[in-house]
Structure formats: C-alpha cells, structure tokens
Amino acid sequence: YEMLRSLVGSEMCIRDSGNGGLGRLASCYMDAATGLGYPVTGFSIRYEFGIFRQKIVDGWQMEFPDNWLEMGDVWLHPRKDDAVEVRFGGQVHEWMDGGKFKTAQTGYQSVIAVPHDLYISGYNSTAVNKLTLWSASMPQSFDMNAFSRGDYVRALEQNTMAEAISKVLYPADNHINGKRLRLRQQYLLVSSSLQSILNEHLKNYHTL
C-alpha cells in the first residue's frame, strides 16, 4: 500500500503544475468518456518539462525547469515498433506516370515519433481507453561522419533539434525560433497521430 501510494503521489506531483487549461479540459473529457463507457483515443506529446516550477526567494518569483520525467514514467507503455516518420521541409515533386498521379518528397528532415500509451480506466466502469503521447528523436542518434572529423557539437546538433520538439510544454514564442518550435510541435502531433489512425484502420480493414 505504501509503495503504491508513493508511486501515485510522485506521479501526481510531477503532473500537477505547468499544464494548460485546454490540456486539462481534454484530460477531463477523456476521463468522463471512459467513465461513461465510450470508446475514445486521445493524442498528445510526451513533454519532458512543464512550463516551470516556481519558488519564492526573498520575495521574488524564481522559475526553474519542471522535470515531469525525473521520477520515471511508470504509467506509460512505449511502442517503438509502432514509431512513425514525420518529415519537415523539403520539396514535393508531382508527375503523371501511366495515367497515375505520383508524388515524391526530397530534401526533408526526418524525425521519428515514438508512441507511449497511457491507459485510462473509468470510474465505476469496465471501460479502458488509451492516450497516446509522442516523443521526438532522430533516426540516428548522431552524425558519425561529423563525430569522426572531430566536429562533436555538429554530430549531436540534429538530434538535439529533433528532441527539442518534445522537450518543453508551451515554449516561449516571442521570437522567431520559438514560433518555429511551436509549429513543429503542432505538425509532429498532427502528422504522427493521423499516421497512427490510418495505420490502425488499414491493419483492421485493409482499405480506406
């Protein structure tokens, strides 16, 4: 009992600050739908840090990173085999081939979105629904060629940029890089979630 209470308490402590109103509302919808027995699947991003952890020092507010994962993520079930590729940038080429319309994308940056499932049980209900949280990483952890040349910072640069997508909830957007990061977060969430929905549909019904 004490171990379970410690687990629940630590997890609640990690998640109880830094969440936005819309995220809280979506969580309530998931909880209510599951309690009523409705089949629902939710999608979001597996953020490493919340907005901030606040302390008052000598009467002044001090902001510190709020690490949501520092005590682990025991409730999440990672599914690396179901990871999807999300492509950023590049060019799309279109052409006709034998009367069929075809496309190809070149010059893009590839980011891998890995799903982590959180299962939600309903109050006074036998229903269990799933919330899928996406984490972002590069297909390769670092550039071996750059590392071999002694360019160690550049060897890790691309992976760091990819991981930044799922690093912080609500990054500051009062500058151009912050706006770009928020757009990348939104694009990763939409692209990976739609791919997951379509893949699951095709697996069960074999056609759109």
How should these model regions be labeled?
Residues 9-11, 43-45, 147, 207-208:
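Short coil/turn segments at secondary-structure boundaries
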Residues 1-9, 13-14:
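Single conserved hydrophobic/aromatic residue that forms the stacking wall/gate
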Residues 32:
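Long, basic N-terminal domains or extensions that often function
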Residues 24-27, 47-56, 139-143, 201-204:
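Flexible loop/turn segments at secondary-structure boundaries
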Residues 19, 35-117:
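Extended, regular secondary-structure scaffolds
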Residues 78-208:
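Active-site cores of enzymes that catalyze phosphoryl transfer or operate on phosphate-rich substrates
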Residues 17-19, 181:
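Active-site rim elements
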